[in-house]
Amino acid sequence: MSEVASWQPDVLGPGYEMMTLALGTDYEGEVTATLVRRRPADPKGRRAVLYVHGYNDYFFQEHVADFYAGLGVSFYALDLRKHGRSLLPHQTAYLCLSLREYFPEIDAAVAMIRRDGHELVLVSGHSTGGLVVSLWAAEGGNRGLVDALILNSPYLSSGVPLAVRLAVDPVCRVLVRRNPAAAFPLRLSPRYARSLHRCYEGEWDFNTAWKSVRGTRLRMAWLASIHAGQRRVREGLGITAPVLVLCGTASGNRKTPAPELFAVDIVLDVAQIAQLSPSLGRDVTCTRIAGAIHDVFLSRPAVRQQAFDELADWLTAHDLVSEIRQKPCRSGD
C-alpha cells in the first residue's frame, strides 16, 4: 500500500474524520478504501474498535460509535473498496473475486489504529463484513493483531442447500472467468433497506447512493467468493481471540409483513448463524436477541438497547473495557 493521506472532515459532520487508504490497482484500475474515525474525547485512550460494514452498506451508524465512546473505546470504521465512500467512478459496486481482496485495507486500518497509540484493538463486522473479518482474523499473520471479534449477524451461511451450491458454483466460476462482472438476472430485494430508511418504513437516515433502496445486482464473482469463505468457516477457522456473535432469534423473508418485519432477520437464517458460530474459534459466545433484525443495532430501541447491554457485559467480562463505565447512550436520547 502506498502512503496514506491525512485526516480530513467526513460527511457525517463535526466529530468525524476520514482518511483515504490508497491500495494500488486491481483488475478494474485504481483502488481505495476509507477509514473513518470518531474524534475521541480522550485521545490517549489505549482501546479502540474497528467496524466493518456489510454488503450494500457503509458506515453511518453514529449511535454505535457513541456506544463505544461511552465505554472509553475509540471508534473507527472502514468503508471497504467499492463500497460507500470508497466507490470510484470506474468501479463495479461490491465486485470482488475473493474475500481476501479486502485484507489489505483491514491491515492498513489496524496499522493506523496502532499508529494512533491504541494497544488493544477490537474488530467488529456486520453480515458480509462479519465473514470477512473472521477470515482475516484466522490468517496466521493476523492472529496477534486483534484482541477480540464482535460479529453482528455474520454471513456464515447462504442458506443454500449443498446440492444447489455444488451445481451453481462451477457455473459461476466459468462465467466469471469470461466476465468478472457477470451478474445474475434478478436484483436483490430492496425490502430490507427500505425497512430501515426513514423515507420508507424505518427510522434511519443514510445515503441511498451508498446503501441502495432500489435493489442491487448480485455479481457471480461475489457470490462465488462468499461461498468459498463460508466453506472455510464450515471447516473451522481456529480464531484464537474471543468472539462474540450477536443475532436474532427468528428469521423471515422479503414478504414478511409489518410489524413482524421489524422483529426478525429477513436477510439471513439466524439458526444457521448460531449453528455455525462454534466453528469460528476456541472461545465463541453466541448471544441471540429476541426481536432483533438483521443489523441488531438498527433494531427497535428496546431491542438494540438489549444488544448494547449484552455487548457491554461481554466486553467487561473479557476485561476489554474498564469495569467502571458510562451507561451507553440510546439513539435519540
Predicted regions and their residues:
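Short beta-strand element of the alpha/beta-hydrolase
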Residues: 46-54
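Catalytic active-site module of serine/aspartate enzymes centered on a nucleophile-bearing elbow/loop
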Residues: 283-333
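Conserved alpha/beta-hydrolase
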Residues: 57-65, 69-90
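N-terminal cap/lid segment of alpha/beta-hydrolase-fold proteins
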Residues: 1-42
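Catalytic nucleophile-loop/oxyanion-hole region of alpha/beta-hydrolase
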Residues: 56, 84-120, 303-307
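Alpha/beta-hydrolase-fold enzymes
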Residues: 128, 132-218
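Serine-hydrolase catalytic core
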Residues: 183-288
